[in-house]
């Protein structure tokens, strides 16, 4: 396969890896959600499982669009006008498919998320997800129309306020499309690091010589160094990438069907999530990512939030029902 330069980053919980340096990032895992796709007569497409700090998988009794549910409660600060106007609070939302439906250039990252910071509370929250047109800034209708059709993933972590700049700098090479940038006066200096749309000309992207496949890069990182099973969206346009099966080196094998306890089984064609799980039991890494394994996306910027945890990795390994094996 042709080798080429591409832009990417990998955000490891506890270690930030930019391919040129490693900086400690004191993050705390909050939750992972896996939403089911719509399945006629079985699922509405709003059911989901929840993995919290205790690392136990549960099916949540509320639907994902519930205004009193975990997503709504996590995003409550951006729904509340009094909080948004607070001097020491700020947030950004970024997406290659924003809620207003506008078209976003491919020069921006194929990435979606919300980043909130509260200087007074000395904390921040980062929610990385795969859902188009999400979130709308209304607690009662924050979930998008059409959001039930396909499976989606969400990962949420918290961090100390002083780590905000490091996280922002690690995101810069992915050039996310930021649609609202809202912050109080005292947070402005720090949040200006995330004013991508105003400072793109000043960014020096991180470069990595690779095949252009984020998941091949993850598999070959010294911290991971494992074969991977990978779930990504099977795009209707473009050429999907086959499993990566080098004679030497780490394999990256596409998942073809998924089975999630409490939700059921579905095919890759119904799953818009992007995640990978290591097969080496001594290196229990799980990543929730931005980009798909498709030729059209090998030049697209994006990254992943990864966590090394045996319980989470064991859970995600069980999701693999069938794969395109080498």
Predicted feature locations:
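PLD/PLD-like phosphodiesterase catalytic module centered on the HKD motif
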Residues: 2-326
């Amino acid at each position: 396969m042709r080798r080429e330069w591409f832009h990417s980053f990998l955000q490891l919980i506890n270690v930030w890896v930019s391919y040129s340096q490693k900086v400690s990032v004191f993050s705390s895992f909050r939750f992972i959600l896996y939403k089911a796709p719509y399945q006629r007569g079985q699922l509405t497409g709003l059911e989901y499982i929840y993995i919290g700090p205790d690392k136990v998988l549960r099916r949540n009794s509320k639907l994902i669009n519930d205004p009193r549910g975990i997503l709504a409660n996590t995003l409550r600060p951006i729904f509340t006008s009094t909080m948004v106007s607070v001097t020491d609070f700020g947030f950004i939302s970024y997406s290659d498919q924003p809620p207003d439906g506008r078209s976003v250039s491919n020069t921006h990252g194929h990435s979606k998320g919300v980043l909130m910071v509260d200087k007074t509370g000395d904390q921040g929250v980062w929610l990385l997800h795969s859902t188009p047109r999400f979130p709308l800034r209304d607690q009662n209708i924050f979930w998008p129309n059409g959001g039930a059709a396909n499976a989606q993933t969400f990962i949420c972590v918290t961090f100390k306020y002083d780590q905000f700049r490091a996280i922002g700098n690690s995101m810069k090479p992915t050039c996310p499309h930021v649609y609202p940038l809202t912050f109080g006066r005292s947070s402005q200096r720090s949040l200006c690091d995330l004013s991508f749309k105003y400072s793109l000309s000043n960014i020096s992207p991180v470069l990595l010589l690779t095949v252009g496949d984020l998941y091949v890069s993850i598999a070959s990182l010294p911290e991971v160094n494992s074969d991977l099973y990978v779930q990504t969206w099977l795009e209707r346009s473009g050429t999907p990438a086959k499993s990566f099966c080098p004679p030497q080196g780490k394999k990256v094998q596409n998942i073809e069907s998924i089975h999630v306890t409490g939700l059921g089984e579905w095919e890759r064609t119904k799953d818009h999530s992007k995640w990978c799980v290591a097969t080496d039991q001594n290196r229990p890494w799980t990543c929730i990512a931005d980009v798909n394994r498709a030729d059209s996306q090998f030049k697209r910027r994006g990254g992943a939030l990864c966590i090394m945890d045996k319980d989470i990795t064991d859970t995600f390994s069980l999701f693999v029902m069938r794969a395109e094996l080498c």
